A protein has these predicted regions:
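Acidic, turn-prone loop/beta-hairpin segments
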Residues: 162, 254, 258, 265-270, ...
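Alpha-helical recognition segments enriched in aromatics with Gly/Pro capping
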Residues: 345-346, 373-385, 496-499, 503-509, ...
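Secondary-structure capping and boundary motifs in well-ordered enzyme cores
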Residues: 115-121, 136, 140, 160, ...
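N-terminal catalytic cores of NTP/NDP-binding nucleotidyl/phosphoryl-transfer enzymes
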Residues: 108-172, 225, 234, 299-302, ...
Length: 1008
């Protein structure tokens, strides 16, 4: 009869199938489930035991199928609300020391000793679907959230979506047009209602994808930026800034998108280099008698269509060429309008002809010039960039059609002096790619400098050298400060219907504005009921910039309703991309510092800047590019769809790929081959689990039992334990220490490589194979040794699963639940404690000794590959021990190898190990630590063919090495090449040099 597995409640110890205290009872009573008190060492306070909702027991199938596993656990995590963080009870708020230098922004809670770790998800557009940038960002955030949760921190990761004003309105407008109507025909109210319906039906795509990919967010706190509670915060912020004199309305030059028909911010303009022209136009000079003198002042322009709105021509006061034209009047070509010549030192004498047309309504520099000289502004284009009535005969023409027509007319009248080629940067709308038009428009602005001053102070060190906010990598801190130091007032109004409508009402009687928190019924100035609300909406970034305060209850922070704010604000960390550093990050810092600063601390004292910031740290992640480091775009056809890759390889493999490549400050060259490799890694772990379960079953059948009390905590060994046990424990402690340190430093790549190296390299490739030698179920005399080996195997495997869990949550969850036969002590491995190391448990001698064995085994394996030995073939090897000694291996190389002969023979697939004074003639050899090793293979080697192959390889390696050395020796190359290119070339050089040395050695060893 097969003995059933044992289930028991204890996060710290695996409920492995058979243990000391009940194997005989279990054999008689297959349905009995025993319970054992867990070791508190690995239990987080928030962890709870299994429940009736726990999945039914199941064995690990032979084949690893990530899709089936991931669908199941993704649904389970959401259904069980495993990652929910409830509002703290009154009085259980956290204490703050306000220092961003504290590791990962962690803070201790007085009530339970837990440290809040709070992340705000950068809200994706409600119109969006997951792309590789999202998955990369979510992977990093989720690793950190799961890691902190397993460190028993109070983790809150808040999800949500942005209403995305322009993008959403454009999408719904296209749908409306396809139905044969327009938003204008529908009217504002009906159109906005249509957008809300669209959002209800299609707006949750990306969040659904996040759920499928296992993001450990608190779904109960999901927000939408136009939710009622957030809308209240938006209106309060606008009104408060207006009351403080920091919001004003005025006519200024803005970036106008003719396609979106709205103003857009400087950050929403993308500049591309284009080859254009510089048109030189003759402006007739008017004499004192009001008649043309026959002289012309030639003006250079890149936009001749805007000349219809010229109000002056400016020259430098010290330009001797034009001294005689001071105070003269000119006749504006094609319009017959008279305009003055003005003097301004802003004019560059070296550009064009040194005379510039002044068009205040269509150029920001000209607008400033017009303000200085009290010039009028003539707007000659409408919202669609067509010439308006001010353009006379050109009215109704598209701007570029008008340009062509104007140039033709100028030439026909002899007023076109010349055309020169000219390269210029042209701004495009980042959403619709339409060329942006600088346009004079009545807009709402935030007087930004007072807010910026606080945001700058938050990032700069204070008198004690501490920063309220740390930006990492540090180069982005400099970029942030430079941008903030040159910031301009923020245009916050958008000519859209979808968004937060500006809470301002104009009066038809007194013509003043009423700004109010609640919709007014009459003018606040004259009492008239003839008031009309502003039609514009607020910039999307205004509402999203308030999220760190608004999601935690601001502005309604009262004594009864402040637990969330006091516990979770400031948040700990923001993980985001460089592309929204100024769009979003800077604005959150400005608005957060400004508004949170007015919220008293829990004890009633004034909130200092360090407690007003929206987050303690900002981690700027890299961009995900294709395998050739090209930016992904639909145009290039190189876009990688993460959902499709996940379907093929599994979420865990894609997550681990992204984590392994996440080096701070270096863009990721996503390569599907890496994902294939990590899919194999996941399969390796799966097979290791099946091997362990199989051997636990076998052991139980002969009454070999494992004491559950030893499981769960970090394993320890005595000095008399076998080498492999002392070594694997040392490696485990060292790996755990380094992984924790790497995650504290946001080195996801280093942490991933450490885990891979340990789990695949140390545990699976070496330790598991050595343990097979110790598991002897047939010899009663070896029962104690078998039990010890099996116990250590299970201990190390359990810790390894917890170590890997934040990176591969689905795989580890499945194996963990299977270990417990579907009745685990907690609902998830994510609620267990993350491994913690003890440096005193690292046996450096054992590590050094295993390096010797690993070196011999790896060199032997390489030799087998070189001479074509079949993978499963067992053949003799020769070992020539050198004179070198090492403290790790005691008396010498040969005695050490003889002591561990069984390990060498098994892992090197050697039928025997022959110790010789000299490697036999004709054998290929490799240097292995303190000696040489050769493989004796009774197969005919075609020596001439092998010599020819090696000669070609040597020539190839020499050529490649010379090329790499030439590039690395070039100062010009080193100065201009990106760091990742230089590092890659150095790595390539080292690898090529090693291959060359091995090929030369192999050639020299050939007989004849």
């Amino acid at each position: 009869m097969r003995v059933p597995r044992l289930s028991w409640c204890g996060i710290s110890s695996f409920g492995f199938r058979h243990f000391d205290f009940g194997a005989r009872i279990l054999a008689r009573a297959p349905l009995l489930k025993l319970k054992v008190v867990p070791s508190v060492e690995t239990v987080c306070p928030s962890a709870s035991g299994g429940s009736s909702t726990t999945p039914m027991p199941h064995d690990l199938p032979k084949a690893y199928d990530p899709t089936a596993i991931e669908d199941h656990w993704a649904e389970y995590w959401v259904r069980e609300n495993l990652f929910a963080q409830p509002t703290p009870k009154p009085g259980s708020t956290s204490t703050h020391d306000g220092s961003a230098s504290e590791a990962s922004g962690r803070r201790k809670s007085e009530s339970d000793g837990q440290s809040p770790f709070v992340i705000l998800l950068p809200p994706p557009n409600v119109t969006g679907s997951l792309h590789m940038g999202h998955m990369f960002e979510h992977t990093e955030s989720d690793i950190l959230a799961r890691w902190h949760r397993m460190r028993c921190d109070r983790v809150l990761w808040v999800p949500g979506t942005d209403h995305a004003g322009i993008a959403t309105q454009m999408l719904v407008e296209r749908q409306v047009v396809s139905e044969g109507t327009t938003r204008q025909k529908m009217g504002r109210e009906a159109f906005v209602e249509r957008v809300w319906k669209w959002r209800e039906h299609y707006g949750g795509t990306i969040l659904g994808q996040m759920k499928r990919l296992g993001a450990s967010v608190d779904w109960q706190r999901e927000y939408f930026t136009m939710d009622e509670r957030l809308s209240v915060a938006v209106r309060e912020a606008f009104v408060k800034l207006h009351e403080q004199g920091l919001i004003y309305r005025g006519a200024y030059i803005v970036n106008w998108c003719p396609r979106c028909q709205t103003a857009i911010s400087d950050l929403e303009v993308v500049y591309d280099e284009h080859k254009g022209h510089l048109w030189e136009i003759r402006y007739p000079v008017i004499g004192d008698d009001g008649k043309d003198t026959g002289e012309f002042l030639t003006v250079a322009t890149t936009r001749p269509e805007t000349m219809l709105g010229d109000v002056a021509v400016a020259i430098h006061p010290d330009d001797d060429r034009y001294t005689h034209l001071h105070a003269k009047m000119l006749r504006l070509p094609l319009t017959n309008r008279e305009i003055p010549v003005i003097l301004d030192e802003w004019v560059s004498r070296d550009f064009g002809t040194g005379a510039v047309k002044v068009t205040p309504a269509h150029d920001p520099n000209d607008f400033a010039l017009g303000q200085r000289h009290n010039l009028p502004s003539i707007n000659v284009m409408d919202e669609t960039a067509h010439i308006n009535a001010e353009g006379g005969a050109y009215a109704g023409l598209d701007r570029f059609v008008a340009r062509k027509k104007i140039v033709e007319d100028l030439e026909a009248q002899g007023l076109l002096a010349g055309i020169k080629d000219h390269t210029l940067n042209i701004g495009h709308c980042s959403r619709c790619k339409t060329i942006v038009e600088p346009r004079l428009s009545l807009q709402w602005f935030v007087k930004i400098q007072p807010l910026a001053d606080k945001a700058i102070a938050a990032v700069r060190p204070d008198a004690e050298g501490k920063k309220a906010i740390r930006i990492f990598p540090e180069q982005y801190e400099k970029v942030y400060l430079e941008w903030m130091g040159n910031i301009h007032d923020w245009c916050i109004s958008r000519q859209l219907w979808w968004g937060h409508r500006i809470p301002a009402w104009s009066c038809a009687v007194c013509h003043k504005m009423t700004v109010a928190r609640e919709d007014p019924s009459q003018c606040a100035h004259c009492g008239s009921e003839k008031i009309t609300q502003e039609t514009d909406v607020l910039d999307t970034w205004f509402s999203s910039g308030l999220l760190p305060v608004s999601v935690f209850g601001w502005p309604n922070i009262t004594a009864e309703n402040r637990a969330d704010f006091d516990t979770f604000y400031p948040t700990s960390l923001l993980v985001t991309g460089f592309d929204i550093l100024f769009f979003w990050v800077a604005r959150m810092i400005m608005l957060g510092c400004w508004f949170a600063g007015d919220v008293p601390m829990p004890d009633g004292t004034k909130r200092e800047l360090k407690e007003s910031v929206p987050f303690r740290e900002v981690y700027i992640h890299a961009l995900v590019r294709d395998a050739n480091r090209e930016k992904m775009s639909k145009t290039k056809g190189n876009v990688v769809d993460p959902i499709e890759i996940v379907k093929q390889y599994g979420t865990d493999a894609v997550r681990f790929t992204l984590a392994s490549m996440a080096s701070p400050g270096t863009d990721i060259a996503f390569n599907i081959a890496r994902t294939e490799g990590y899919r194999a890694f996941a399969n390796k772990i799966w097979n290791a689990a099946r091997f362990i379960f199989m051997n636990v079953d076998r052991a139980a059948e002969i009454d070999i039992k494992v004491d559950p009390a030893v499981l769960g905590a970090m394993p320890t060994v005595g000095a008399d334990a076998p080498l492999e046990a002392r070594w694997i424990v040392a490696e485990l402690h060292a790996t755990v220490a380094n992984v924790n340190k790497s995650l504290e430093d946001y080195r996801f790549d280093v942490a991933a490589h450490l885990i891979e190296k340990f789990f695949w390299g140390d545990f699976c490739s070496y330790y598991l194979e050595i343990v097979k030698l110790r598991l002897d179920f047939s010899d009663p005399a070896k029962k104690t040794a078998t039990r010890a080996a099996l116990t250590m195997l299970i201990q190390v495997f359990e810790v390894s699963l917890r170590l890997l869990s934040p990176f591969m949550p689905f795989l580890t969850e499945e194996i963990w639940h299977t270990v417990y036969d579907g009745n685990p002590p907690a609902k998830s491995i994510a609620l267990t404690q993350y491994p913690q190391s003890d440096n005193s448990k690292i046996d450096h001698g054992a590590r050094g000794a295993m390096i010797v064995l690993e070196n011999l085994i790896s060199e032997t394996r390489a030799l087998r590959k070189d001479i074509g030995v079949e993978e499963n073939a067992v053949v003799p090897i020769e070992v020539c021990a050198g004179p070198g000694l090492n403290a790790s291996i005691g008396g010498g190389y040969e005695p050490f190898l003889r002591e561990n002969l069984a390990i060498v023979e098994r892992l090197a697939r050697a039928s025997e190990v022959r110790f010789v004074q000299q490697i036999s003639a004709g054998l290929l050899r490799r240097h292995a630590y303190a000696g040489d090793v050769a493989v004796i293979y009774e197969a005919t080697i075609d020596v001439p063919a092998e010599r020819e192959r090696l000669t070609k390889d040597i020539a190839k390696y020499e050529k490649g090495l010379a090329s790499a050395e030439r590039q690395l020796g070039s100062e010009g190359f080193l100065a201009k090449a990106p760091l990742h290119i230089v590092d890659g070339l150095k790595k390539q050089e080292a690898e090529t040099r090693l291959l060359l040395e091995k090929a030369r050695a192999a050639l020299a060893a050939l007989p004849g």
